[in-house]
């Protein structure tokens, strides 16, 4: 509700709110649970897409068949599970979507892996022949005014980009700064099972880039341990 009130004060109204989920049998050392549950959106002045209906549907997805079957396979007591709901504004016409992992998955050089794609093109389930930008964002720079050095591992071939990159160098720098702060906080303040040095501590960070209600900016959508 705070998001809606603020946007009205700015003269622009966010009419849709999304309800992703998290729950107590997720991101365990032996069980991720990612993708098993459902997210729904609510829309202002829509009799069918009400907040109440969205919450009920999210809660009900705790008992969808794929989630039940997966928990059973890993011998998780269904009665021990509880679900929480993350509420955020929806992004009906995002400029970019992406995922960042806060460790180098390829070698020992400090850095992040970024997978980002134009608009709502899927990274996880891409259309045949469609590639996304993958960037190794090294956590150092020979430029004293920058903290990171990007190295592209693949390039998006979405025709609408006309060969341009999904994120600008300035946005990559900004995203790196945000995620380094998040990594520092989680490593030092949030209990975790990673008995590892800071360089090897991995978080999976989902982000959006959007310009619907303000000038183009980065939104951190979700943070979870990288398993």
Model regions and ranges:
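Short acidic, glycine-rich loop/turn motifs
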Residues: 21-25, 91, 209-211
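Compositionally biased, intrinsically disordered low-complexity regions
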Residues: 4-6, 12-13, 100, 113, ...
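Conserved catalytic alpha/beta cores of large enzymes that bind or transform nucleotide phosphates
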Residues: 116-212
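Core catalytic machinery and nucleic-acid-binding channels of phosphodiester-processing enzymes
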Residues: 86, 90-91, 97-102, 178-182
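Extended active-site and interfacial segments that coordinate phosphate-rich ligands
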Residues: 34-65, 92-159, 219-227
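N-terminal beta-alpha lobe that positions the nucleotide/phosphoryl donor
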Residues: 1-86, 95, 183-198, 202-204
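Short, low-complexity Ser/Thr-rich regulatory SLiMs
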Residues: 89, 102-105, 207-211
């Amino acid at each position: 509700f705070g998001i809606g009130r603020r946007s009205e004060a700015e003269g622009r109204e966010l009419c849709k709110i999304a309800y992703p989920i998290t729950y107590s049998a997720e991101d365990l050392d032996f069980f991720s649970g990612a993708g098993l549950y459902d997210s729904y959106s609510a829309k202002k002045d829509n009799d069918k897409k009400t907040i109440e209906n969205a919450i009920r549907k999210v809660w009900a997805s705790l008992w969808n068949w794929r989630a039940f079957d997966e928990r059973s396979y890993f011998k998780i007591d269904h009665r021990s599970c509880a679900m929480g709901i993350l509420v955020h504004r929806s992004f009906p016409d995002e400029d970019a979507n992406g995922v960042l992992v806060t460790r180098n998955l390829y070698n020992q050089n400090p850095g992040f892996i970024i997978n980002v794609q134009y608009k709502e093109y899927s990274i996880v389930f891409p259309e045949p022949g469609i590639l996304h930008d993958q960037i190794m964002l090294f956590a150092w720079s020979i430029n004293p005014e920058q903290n990171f050095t990007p190295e592209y591992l693949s390039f998006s071939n979405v025709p609408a980009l006309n060969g341009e990159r999904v994120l600008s160098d300035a946005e990559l720098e900004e995203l790196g700064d945000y995620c380094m702060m998040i990594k520092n906080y989680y490593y030092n303040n949030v209990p975790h099972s990673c008995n590892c040095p800071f360089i090897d501590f991995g978080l999976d960070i989902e982000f959006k880039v959007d310009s619907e209600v303000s000038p183009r900016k980065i939104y951190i959508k979700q943070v979870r341990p990288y398993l």
